[in-house]
C-alpha cells in the first residue's frame, strides 16, 4: 500500500483547471490503487504563513526563546515535514500565475525547506533528505509555455524537489486554457490522458 499526498494551491476553487485535474487524478488513483491512502492538503483554503523576518528565526537553532508566533510556525513546519516524509507519492497542483507558482505553494516550500531535516550541507555540496519519493506535478497555464523560456515552473520545481531529495518527478501540463473553449477542452483531455499514463505506471 502506498500513501499519496496531494497539494492543491489554486485560489480559484471550483473554477480551477489545476483543481479539476487534481480531482481527476485522485479519482483515477483511487480506482486503480484501491488500497492506497490519499491525503489532500489545500494550501489555498488553509494557507500556511509567509516566512518573514520573525518566523525565519524559528527555523534556525538558537538560544533565544521563541515567540508564540514562532512556536506556532515551527510546530506547523514540523507537521508539514512529517506529513511529507510519511507519504510515498507527492502530487503537486501548480497552476501558472504570472509565470510562476502560486504564493500559497511557495509559502509551503519555505516551511519545509529546513537544513538538517529535509536537506543538509556536506563537503560535496547539498544533500536531500526526503528520499524514496515520487512526485507528480499538475500544471495548468493560460498560454503555451512548456519548453520555452517563459516556463519558470518546471525548472524551479525540478531544482527544489531535487534539492530536498525528490528526483523522480513527472509533469502533466494543461496549456492554452485561455485560448478559447476548443483549445481548453483539448488541453484538459490531453492532460487527463497523461494522468492516466502516470497513474498506470
Curated annotation (Swiss-Prot):
UniProt keyword annotation of Nuclease present: no
Keywords, in A-Z order: Flavoprotein, FMN, NAD, Oxidoreductase
The family database entries (SUPFAM superfamilies) matched by this protein are listed as: Flavoproteins
**Top-rank lineage group of the source organism:** Bacteria
Q: What cofactors does the UniProt entry give for this protein?
A: FMN
Cofactor comment in the record? Binds 1 FMN per subunit.
Q: For this protein, what reaction is catalysed?
A: 2 a quinone + NADH + H(+) = 2 a 1,4-benzosemiquinone + NAD(+); N,N-dimethyl-1,4-phenylenediamine + anthranilate + 2 NAD(+) = 2-(4-dimethylaminophenyl)diazenylbenzoate + 2 NADH + 2 H(+)
Name the residues that bind FMN: 10, 16-18, 96-99, 140-145
Molecular function (GO) terms for this protein are: electron transfer activity; FMN binding; oxidoreductase activity, acting on NAD(P)H as acceptor; oxidoreductase activity, acting on NAD(P)H, quinone or similar compound as acceptor
Give start-end ranges for the coiled-coil region(s). Answer: none
Q: Which Gene3D superfamilies match?
A: 3.40.50.360
Q: Does the keyword Transport apply?
A: no
InterPro entries xref list = Flavodoxin_fold (IPR003680), Flavoprotein-like_sf (IPR029039), FMN-dep_NADH:Q_OxRdtase_AzoR1 (IPR050104), NADH:quinone_OxRdtase_FMN_depd (IPR023048)
Q: Which Pfam families match?
A: Flavodoxin_2
The EC number of this protein is: 1.6.5.-, 1.7.1.17
Relate the protein's function as given in its record: Quinone reductase that provides resistance to thiol-specific stress caused by electrophilic quinones.
The record's family statement is:
Belongs to the azoreductase type 1 family.
- Provide the assembly information: Homodimer.
HAMAP family for this protein: Azoreductase_type1
Which protein are we looking at?
FMN-dependent NADH:quinone oxidoreductase
Amino acid at each position: 500500500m502506498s500513501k499519496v499526498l496531494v497539494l492543491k494551491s489554486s485560489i480559484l476553487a471550483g473554477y480551477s483547471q489545476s483543481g479539476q485535474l487534481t480531482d481527476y487524478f485522485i479519482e483515477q488513483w483511487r480506482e486503480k490503487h484501491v488500497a492506497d491512502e490519499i491525503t489532500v492538503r489545500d494550501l489555498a483554503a488553509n494557507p500556511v504563513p509567509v516566512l518573514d523576518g520573525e518566523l525565519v528565526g524559528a527555523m534556525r537553532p538558537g538560544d533565544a526563546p521563541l515567540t508564540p508566533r514562532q512556536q506556532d510556525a515551527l510546530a506547523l513546519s514540523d507537521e508539514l515535514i512529517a506529513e511529507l516524509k510519511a507519504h510515498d507519492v507527492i502530487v503537486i497542483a501548480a497552476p501558472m500565475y504570472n509565470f510562476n507558482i502560486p504564493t500559497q505553494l511557495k509559502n509551503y516550500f519555505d516551511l519545509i525547506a529546513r537544513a538538517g531535516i529535509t536537506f543538509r550541507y556536506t563537503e560535496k555540496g547539498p544533500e536531500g533528505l526526503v528520499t524514496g519519493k515520487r512526485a507528480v506535478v499538475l500544471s495548468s497555464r493560460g498560454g503555451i509555455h512548456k519548453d520555452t523560456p517563459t516556463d519558470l515552473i518546471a525548472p524551479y520545481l525540478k531544482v527544489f524537489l531535487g534539492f530536498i531529495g525528490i528526483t523522480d518527478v513527472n509533469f502533466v501540463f494543461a496549456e492554452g486554457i485561455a485560448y478559447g473553449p476548443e483549445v481548453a477542452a483539448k488541453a484538459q483531455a490531453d492532460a487527463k490522458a497523461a494522468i492516466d499514463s502516470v497513474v498506470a505506471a
